[in-house]
Structure formats: structure tokens, C-alpha cells
A protein has these predicted regions:
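Cytosolic-side membrane-entry/anchor segment at the start of a transmembrane helix
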Residues: 1-31, 138, 142-148
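Select subsegments of transmembrane alpha-helices in polytopic membrane proteins
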Residues: 8-18, 91-102
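Alpha-helical transmembrane segments of multipass membrane proteins
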Residues: 14, 18-22, 54-62, 104, ...
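Membrane-interface helix termini and inter-helical loops of multi-pass transporters
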Residues: 28-41
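Alpha-helical transmembrane segments
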Residues: 43-62, 127-129
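Membrane-helix interface/capping segments
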Residues: 60-85
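Alpha-helical transmembrane segments and their membrane-interface junctions
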Residues: 98-118
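Alpha-helical transmembrane segments and their immediate juxtamembrane interface regions
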Residues: 107-108, 121-148
Length: 148
């Protein structure tokens, strides 16, 4: 398995893990009555800002651990140089990710128009981001295996 494929698999699992853990913590706080997710939209803003910070720090730690383990396992200290093919794969994967995010967000607006509570839109944003990231990394794996 190539370095790029391993990196994308780590990205997919880290995105799912970070989002699931953070969502579980927030849900437990909601059940305990610490925060009211149904009516307090200020809390949603704080939740998103904290989630972004937590996600960035967790990703940095995960990437460092991944590079250390990969260097030990493959005995390669340098990361592969990004060439034209890598840039094309990233470009096509990013396009797929943007399309997915747009469709998910528009679906959230449609559900909102049909009576979904407003707090559901915040949940739709989180799900849209997670699904689009999975699509982006999955697309990269697909394009690397398929070849361009």
C-alpha cells in the first residue's frame, strides 16, 4: 500500500473518531442539562469553535504518530515528493468533496423547509463535513488505485 493510501485511510478514521468522540461528549453534556442544544444557538457557536480547535490539535498529534509509525515500519525517513499526478488526484478529490458538501447542506435546507428544527441544521453541517471528508479521502484512494 502506498504512502498516500495509508495517509488517506488514517485521515478517514481520524475524522470519524474525532467527530464521534466530540459528538458523544456534547451529547452527554446535553443529557446532563449542562447545555441546551435545542434552543441556545450561542452554545452551538461555541461548540463549533471548540470542535475546530480540538480537531486541529488532534489531527496534528495523529499525523505525527502516523509519520513516526510509518517511518519505523517502512524504514523511510522522507515523505514522498508530490508530483503532477498527486496534484491532479487531490484536485479531483477536492471537487468530489465540494459537490458532496453542497448536496448535503442543500439537503439540510430542504429538510429545514419541511419542518426540521433549526438545531438539526447544525447537526447537518457536522454530518456534511464528515461525509465530504470521507468522500475526499475515499476518492483519493480510488484515484491512486485506478491510476490517471
Amino acid at each position: 500500500m502506498s504512502y498516500q493510501e495509508k495517509k488517506n485511510i488514517v485521515n478517514i478514521f481520524s475524522a470519524m473518531l474525532i467527530t464521534a468522540i466530540y459528538a458523544w461528549i456534547i451529547y452527554q453534556k446535553h443529557l446532563a442539562g449542562t447545555i441546551n442544544l435545542r434552543e441556545d444557538f450561542t452554545s452551538w457557536g461555541m461548540i463549533f469553535l471548540i470542535f475546530i480547535g480540538v480537531s486541529i490539535v488532534a489531527r496534528i498529534v495523529i499525523y505525527i504518530i502516523f509519520h513516526i509509525i510509518n517511518a519505523i515500519a517502512t524504514r523511510e525517513t522522507d515523505t514522498p515528493v508530490e508530483d503532477e499526478r498527486d496534484k491532479m488526484v487531490k484536485l479531483m478529490s477536492t471537487r468530489n468533496s465540494y459537490y458532496t458538501f453542497s448536496v448535503c447542506v442543500m439537503s439540510g435546507f430542504v429538510l429545514l423547509a419541511f419542518g426540521m428544527p433549526v438545531y438539526g441544521m447544525f447537526i447537518a453541517f457536522v454530518i456534511s463535513g464528515l461525509v465530504s471528508e470521507i468522500v475526499e479521502n475515499g476518492s483519493q484512494i480510488y484515484y491512486y488505485r485506478k491510476g490517471l
